[in-house]
Amino acid sequence: MEEKQEKVAEFYDKVTGAWDLFYGVHLHDGYYEPGTTATMAISQDAVIRMIDELLRFAGVSEDPAKKPRSMLDVGSGLGGTCVYVAKKYDIQCTGITISPNQVKYAQDYAATEGVENKVSFDCGDALDMPYSDGKFDVVFTINCIEHVHDKEKFIREMVRVAAPGAAIIIASQAHPNLSPGESLKPRDKKILQKICDGAGAVSLCSSDDYVRWLTPLPVKEIKAADWTQNITPLYPLLMKEAFTWKGFTSIVLKGGWRAINLINAVRLVAKAANDGILKFAVVTGRKSI
């Protein structure tokens, strides 16, 4: 494993569990109706809804006769997405993460949910995945590509392991789309890098970048959407709860003092999203037959 990727693995090994008060076993953003007032009571439902909305947007059928037979979650975290999809669709799900601690947690979680025979997790590099070409009917990633240096290679690997006709789903934090010749303002670039540093991410790109990297590959029906308004309702809740005694101690006890950087990053994320310099991009396509 390259040194850069080892640092990502180390980060996740140290902060795994720090945010489970808000996300449970789903280390990704939730989906809210714009203008919703997020509460702790609905935050778990929102992360589940995000999975459903992404699959729906990508055209993944729930019809038993047309449903996928297998799914790969790239950057599978604590295993929440794989376990949920395996149960909902009654299919085989595989997760890959660079964090050994997350693999162990995910395996234990799958066992407690009774789907250990339908779900498996591998510790590996998303830039060089240990899977054969055309293996999976759905290839899914959310809030992962931000942590990868070579994002174009990441996408090529996703497409490589996707079966003909497979849905390919990419969802991530992103910067705004830019016109030809346009670049991020130095101030905005600095703010986004501070967010990345606090969240253990490497860099952000735009949804146009994802589309540009997918276009020369054997992928059709490429479409993109901006779901920023659907994730921002959570930010006020995160800022409020993270500074309660319960929230603060949960984050520090489970994630260590390094997790404090995540709290600071939340402040920046909320403001950047409000100012329009941070987006939540969704891009999907279908592997050509």
Curated annotation (Swiss-Prot):
Pfam family, one: Methyltransf_11
Induction of its expression: Up-regulated upon methyl jasmonate treatment.
Positions of region (SAM motif I): 71-80
Regulation of its activity: Inhibited by gamma-tocopherol.
Pathways per UniProt: Alkaloid biosynthesis; vindoline biosynthesis
EC number: 2.1.1.99
Placement of sequence motif Microbody targeting signal: 287-289
A GO cellular-component term linked to this record: thylakoid
Principal location class: other
InterPro entries, A to Z: Erg6_SMT_methyltransf, Methyltransf_11, MTs_g-TMT, SAM-dependent_MTases_sf
Subcellular location field: Thylakoid; Peroxisome
Enzymatic class: transferase
Catalytic activity annotation: (3R)-3-hydroxy-16-methoxy-2,3-dihydrotabersonine + S-adenosyl-L-methionine = deacetoxyvindoline + S-adenosyl-L-homocysteine + H(+)
A biological-process GO annotation: methylation
Cross-referenced CDD domains: AdoMet_MTases
Keywords (A to Z) from UniProt: Alkaloid metabolism, Methyltransferase, Peroxisome, S-adenosyl-L-methionine, Thylakoid, Transferase
Tissue: Mainly expressed in young leaves, and, to a lower extent, in mature leaves, flowers, stems and roots (at protein level).
Residue numbers spanned by region SAM motif III: 161-170
Region (SAM motif II): 134-142
Disulfide bonds: none
GO molecular function terms noted in the UniProt entry: 16-methoxy-2,3-dihydro-3-hydroxytabersonine N-methyltransferase activity; N-methyltransferase activity
Recorded family membership: Belongs to the class I-like SAM-binding methyltransferase superfamily. gTMT family.
Function: S-adenosyl-L-methionine-dependent N-methyltransferase that catalyzes a nitrogen methylation involved in vindoline biosynthesis. Displays a strict requirement for a 2,3-dihydro bond in the aspidosperma skeleton. Can use 2,3-dihydrotabersonine, 2,3-dihydro-3-hydroxytabersonine and 2,3,6,7-tetraydro-3-hydroxytabersonine as substrates, but not tabersonine, vincadifformine, 21-hydroxycyclolochnericine, tryptamine, norharmane, harmaline, catharanthine, norajmaline, ajmaline, serpentine, ajmalicine, yohimbine or gamma-tocopherol. Inactive with picrinine as substrate.
Subunit structure: Homodimer.
UniProt xrefs under PANTHER family: GERANYL DIPHOSPHATE 2-C-METHYLTRANSFERASE, ZGC:194242
This protein's name: 3-hydroxy-16-methoxy-2,3-dihydrotabersonine N-methyltransferase
